[in-house]
């Protein structure tokens, strides 16, 4: 049985990574695909754990070689998912989660129409502003640019199957887990997973 591909996107500062990490800790059946990026690591980020950090030239080389499942220019830096991180795992029956932006999500849905997509929204603009400022990693100019970009990203929430409002962290994680559980109970998935039982019941 082929695995399920999950897409999770959100504007910067909405708490996407924290929710994803907490959800994966509860649901070990899903593997997180580590994205490639051409941007420099932020304080505390480690290569191959948070991202695969490569130069812009290396990223362009991977694009030309057709190595990416999806890629996009995000906040002036390239981000992408390697084919090798997704296709073999799905074919082997493993569920894979992509933590990407809306541009990459649109590309993925074109290639995998049955992918399950989730968009995370902050509870308010003020909360988004406060969360981004707490990071303390960007100048005021960069912060203003990121807030403007976040508002642009939120316009695309209607392209996703599910929407989570991250007002209370534990609730948001529980809602994410519920989405994963529900997707596994879809008729098509259950029909494949329990084909023998269904045949026995209906014969």
Swiss-Prot record:
The keyword Nucleotide-binding applies. It is found in: Cytoplasm. Residues 3-181 form the Guanylate kinase-like domain. Its main location: cytoplasm. ATP binds at residues 10-17. Essential for recycling GMP and indirectly, cGMP. This is Guanylate kinase. It comes from Xanthomonas axonopodis pv. citri (strain 306).
């Amino acid at each position: 049985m082929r695995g399920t591909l999950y897409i999770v996107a959100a504007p910067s500062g909405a708490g996407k990574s924290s929710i994803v990490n907490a959800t994966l800790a509860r649901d070990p059946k899903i593997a997180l695909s580590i994205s490639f990026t051409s941007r420099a690591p932020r304080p505390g980020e480690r290569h191959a754990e948070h991202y695969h950090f490569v130069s812009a030239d290396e990223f362009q080389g991977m694009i030309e070689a057709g190595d990416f499942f999806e890629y996009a220019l995000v906040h002036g830096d390239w981000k992408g998912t390697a084919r090798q991180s997704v296709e073999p795992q799905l074919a082997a029956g493993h569920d894979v989660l992509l933590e990407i932006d809306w541009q990459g999500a649109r590309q993925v849905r074109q290639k995998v129409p049955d992918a399950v997509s989730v968009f995370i929204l902050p509870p308010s603009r003020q909360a988004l502003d406060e969360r981004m400022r707490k990071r303390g990693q960007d100048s005021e100019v960069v912060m203003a640019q990121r807030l403007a970009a976040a508002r642009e990203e939120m316009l695309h929430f209607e392209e996703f199957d599910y929407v989570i409002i991250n007002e209370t962290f534990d609730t948001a994680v529980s809602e994410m887990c519920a989405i994963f559980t529900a997707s596994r109970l879809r008729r098509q998935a259950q029909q494949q997973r329990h084909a023998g039982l269904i045949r026995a019941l209906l014969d």
